[in-house]
Amino acid sequence: MRFYFIYSAGGGAGDWNGVKRVWNDWMPEYMKSRILLKFGDVFLEHASGTHFIRPQRWRKISNLREWLFDNVRDEFVYSHDCNILLDSGTAKAVNLIAHHNPTTNCDKLIDSFNRTFDENDVFEKYISVVCDSEIDSTVTFDIPNPFKIRSQNGNARLNILERKSNDKLIELSAEYSNIIYEGLERAKGSHYADSVITTIINGTWDQHEIDLFLSKLNYNPDKIAIGALSSNSINSSVLKECLDNLAPFRFETASQLHFLGCGGFKKTKTIKEYGFDGDNISVDCSTFINRSIDGNTRGTAESGYFDYISKELIRINPRTVGEILDIHSNIRNPLYTCEELEEILDGVLRHQSGNSSPETYNARAKLMFHNADVYRYNAES
């Protein structure tokens, strides 16, 4: 199983500026050889924004490899060894629409989604970006059920898309997939379209629903992305039931089968034990990012270190530094030496003591690379 490093999946500007600064010296080639980018992260506004798209980025950015290079100044991102998976990131679009329409129902949300995409020529932009960026695998569009939408008053809304609308959503997902495929085919031919399009299938669909979706496609999908399984509500037993529904379709024989957001320790273990393993199977997750930057400058929250072997998270504070270094000293071939890790931990502690600086953000970024390496090791071992 392979692991994709998500670039720009969360955190504030300070943390991602830290990533940019330390990338060249500290990001190992084996980890930056598989990068997941999200179209929504780059081009779509946050839920609280007044626009759907980010106008300046929409106008100026067409090549995401170039955009990534401008951020990290690393020629490697232009090489064929840097495999880029582009996720459409449509959950962000659903979040934005629902945020501005807090009482919307399922049908109205779908109509708003379609209208917004048409008005902004989103599919055309997506196809253009894929072609200009030489993306290796590009995930098609669906209308995902966001796991959590926060309204202005702080209330969380879950599952705004009703189960009874599934057939309509399935047919729309197939329609969107056909639009992407046909656009890629017009731009660069059918061989190119077949080689990059990564058709998203909702992992919670039953076998009838998967059959319905596949029957609506105007092409034979060779790469598959499985979505909707990253929610915390999908525990190991539910995940196994979902895998039972996927198994008859032999998706593991695809040239690539990617489980979106399922790179956490428990889900990776369940997926591998079920039999979905091998170089053509891949995962990603953002947990390593979030735990690395949990700590705040007020000292009321702490960043965490993941152990390669136990997979346990140890919160970083003056009492745990010795324990972390002792654990790390027994790891064979870690990303950082104990001396390098000690310097990183010192920077994290200074940040959490109210002494933030570019150097402390650099330390958090390096911690992010370590935690990502633990998740990579877990997936690939």
Model-derived segments and spans:
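Non-catalytic, usually N-terminal nucleic-acid engagement modules in DNA/RNA processing proteins
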Residues: 1-192
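Phenylalanine-focused residue identity feature
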Residues: 3-5, 39, 43, 52, ...
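Glycine/Thr-rich beta-alpha phosphate-binding loop at enzyme active sites
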Residues: 152-174, 194-280, 285-313
